[in-house]
Amino acid sequence: VNIQILVYHQPYIPVHRNIIPGVLNMKVPRCMSTQHPDNVNPPFFAEEPELGGEDEIREAYYVFSHLGCDEQMWDCEGKEVDNYVVKKLLTKYQAFFQDHVLGEDLRLTLRVPNPTVERAEAKILLETLESIPRSYDTASLFYGMDAAPVFEVILPMTSSSSCLNRIHSYYLDFVKGKERLQLADGVTVKEWIGEFRPDEINVIPLFEDHEGMLNAAKITGEYLDGKDLMEQRVFLARSDPAMNYGMISATLLNRIALSDFRDLEEESGVKLYPIIGMGSAPFRGNLRPDNVEDVTGEYRGAYTFTVQSSFKYDHEPSEVIRGIKKLRSVKPGRAPEIERESVLEIISAYCREYRRQVMDLVDIINRVARYVPGRRKRKLHIGLFGYSRSMGNVSLPRAITFTAALYSLGVPPELLGFNALSSGDLEFIEEVYPGLRRDLHDAARYANPESPFLSPEVKSTLEEYIEPEYDEGHMKTTEEIIRALRINRTANLQELILEAASQRKFLG
């Protein structure tokens, strides 16, 4: 595509504005659309049930223009990385993006591989960073002024400030910095090619494991040290910690990190904007269009919430639009104080029992996981193999598939490990996590009390704590799934898994 057609016959006159992240007080998004494949129903614009690269271009436009999200996370890990997403969006949807400036009114935020963990995809990080100035040039031609459509990247599995500083420094020294290099004839790269902008990018740490969550504020503080930043975004996972440590542990770890971020903000004077990665299953966050106020009230201190594929595509569009509007308008709360040591003691006991029960089910989980349908053509990030150290060399599916497999067996993963908690523990947890009863009730609805995979101790403890209202339709479908597995007739197993997921309105 000849990029000149994007200018609308408007001459490009550079308007040099201060676009260094953290210096300009830009509008921080409240609602981040992501590419997590937890949906049952494919979106209407998809050519196939599994979304491919061009579908994701259409998706970004759809969530901006129709659903009302103010940010799209773009995953740069996997087989079909598209470093021309900005050019494609501005080319295909010119009228919309002329009225809505990408990088100011709306954000496209890239999720990059972490070379410390994902060695096989490490060089994709460099390719992605190199694409940022090209996207800047494309947008500047389109808007007729300096425009930075991408100026932040998300680093998954952040475990140290060094991981963040390496990316920040690489961009400054090798992407931006190459313009100062001199060629053999004495001409600089800048004179030959032009400027490389934006001048700087910022890195959003994504904390996904136990240690990362407990040290999130410390790591962020070290990254801020020596930088002239007025604001910083930070990202807390909710899904992978649930898979690794159980739902209650994940929620409590989020609470600790949010409380620590509040303290860091006060000490550093840098405004922090925490993002929480929420799915629709209670296990992965329980964020749906109909309970936005409950969840945002539960996660006081969080500023931005993710809406994943199930939120967007498994509900009526009018409900989704209302839910997103609420997400964007609700006033952020202040993170409360946390009794850290008491919380950590509960996490330790609960996590041990949760992992023991997962180990008992690992074979059946992996067997069912093979039949859980995919919803994206490319894989997302490699992620944490949370059981490889403490539970032997056990391989488990990713969190969405893991969740879908257990729900299909009538064993919502939210219930695992619950029997490790005393009545005193539960009273204390409810002070920190007031929505515990609600989340368990939402999950237990899809349990099958007759499932051979639901342990009697979990069932009895649960029924003492809440009064489950089992969904008869879902119970019947899980009975068919269990019967098919028992007699090894799996021809229609995927169809049954989708039927159960449709009844829940989320895949996993």
PLM regions: where:
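N-terminal amphipathic/basic-hydrophobic helices that include classical n-h-c signal peptides
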Residues: 1-25
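Short boundary motifs at domain starts and secondary-structure transition points
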Residues: 6, 19-22, 97-102, 143, ...
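Acidic, glycine-enriched catalytic cores built around paired aspartates
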Residues: 22-76, 84-94, 104, 303-305, ...
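Structured, charged N-terminal subsegments at the starts of enzyme catalytic cores
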Residues: 73-155, 159-163, 170
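Well-ordered, non-membrane alpha-helical segments in soluble/globular domains
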Residues: 82-94, 124-138, 164-178, 216-222, ...
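Core alpha/beta catalytic barrel or barrel-like domain that forms the active/cofactor pocket
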Residues: 105-114, 142-160, 182-208, 228-247, ...
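Structural alpha-beta junctions
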Residues: 134-147, 174-180, 229, 259-273, ...
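A cross-taxonomic marker for long C-terminal extensions/tails that follow the last structured domain
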Residues: 210-213, 221-294, 309-360
